[in-house]
Amino acid sequence: MVAGTRCLLALLLPQVLLGGAAGLIPELGRRKFAASWPGRSSSQPSDDVLSEFELRLLSMFGLKQRPTPSRDPVVPPYMLDLYRLHSGQPGAPAPGHRLERAASLANTVRTFHHEESLEELPEMSGKTTRRFFFNLTSIPTEEFITSAELQVFGKHMPEALENNSSFHHRINIFEIIKPATANSKFPVTRLLDTRLVTQNASRWESFDVTPAVMRWTAQGLTNHGFVVEVAHPEDSYGASKRHVRISRSLHQDEHSWSQIRPLLVTFGHDGKGHPLHRREKRQAKHKQRKRLKSSCKRHPLYVDFSDVGWNDWIVAPPGYHAFYCHGECPFPLADHLNSTNHAIVQTLVNSVNSKIPKACCVPTELSAISMLYLDENEKVVLKNYQDMVVEGCGCR
């Protein structure tokens, strides 16, 4: 284990010495933790301490238990692009106005794939219709949905242009109010969104389904799913039917289908912290004077998720630079120590009365990180976590 993680355990361990918990850290991670514990003989942490340590970290991440993916996770490319965008990575796609608006009100993004065992609705002349059901029960009750969109992939169909056929067709998205019955072949629906799309490019088409998802989650109405209807022009029925990928091809493998299958994306806020934002690289602050080596300042601390065996459910990042504050707050306090008036007074009193403690070196500025992970239900989640990175230290 890297030295930084030892510091993390040393810094956080006093907060978790409150009792035992079920074993959560995988055996590999447990051995790495124990092997790195200072002293390592009689002083190394017990299984109960390690378990409680991880339990507290999971609670900080808003998880009740450690996710245990059953197989290699399928992460939609959309979520990887969204993570790169909000973590400020180079090469991230430019955000659209709609995405920026949705993310500006949310600190959590979740994705859902539909259940593929549903029946195909009766075919109508010139139209292809499918019923889609997305199980949203994994959304926490305290999470308020601010926006939701249904994404459908459209494949470039050059033959439509070669045959001089129309390369436009309409996609309609309906909410199912009442499902089909024995007496009625068609469900009762409500139109949510509609768009005229073209076949001259391969791209994702996004449709606003916020009203339906809010009714299901906030108002507790029954989720009967959606109907996706593709209206084909008479001269391009075959091409447009192949263009919009709302069902899996007969011989299509699982991996390729997972990259283009319909996707429901929800944007929500759990009432904690700030919404997602595009992280910009911070400019280094100019030092006003040469600091003493022992004075209060920020030190390196890298948290590697593989050291506790979490790399099987945390997709990105593999770790992050958390940093920590350490050092002396000597009298008199210099300007660069970013002190409060109270800290200045306390340090002054300490200089004449040693019973009064000195001011402490603590974080004065913290920033958030974005994490992409699989939750307990193997749903892909992008979440913004506040106060994870120390940006500045001072005497307080």
Curated annotation (Swiss-Prot):
One of its GO terms (molecular function) is cytokine activity. Glycans are attached at N135, N163, N164, N200, N338. Residues 1-23 form the signal peptide. It comes from the Eukaryota. The modification Phosphoserine is found at S87. Pfam families: TGF_beta (PF00019), TGFb_propeptide (PF00688). CDD domains: TGF_beta_BMP2 (cd19390). Disulfide bonds join C296-C361, C325-C393, C329-C395. InterPro entries: BMP2_TGF_beta-like, Cystine-knot_cytokine, TGF-b_C, TGF-b_propeptide, TGF-beta-rel, TGFb_CS. SMART domains: TGFB. It is found in: Secreted. GO terms for biological process: cartilage development; cell differentiation; ossification; positive regulation of odontoblast differentiation. Growth factor of the TGF-beta superfamily that plays essential roles in many developmental processes, including cardiogenesis, neurogenesis, and osteogenesis. Induces cartilage and bone formation. Initiates the canonical BMP signaling cascade by associating with type I receptor BMPR1A and type II receptor BMPR2. Once all three components are bound together in a complex at the cell surface, BMPR2 phosphorylates and activates BMPR1A. In turn, BMPR1A propagates signal by phosphorylating SMAD1/5/8 that travel to the nucleus and act as activators and repressors of transcription of target genes. Belongs to the TGF-beta family. This is Bone morphogenetic protein 2. It comes from Dama dama.
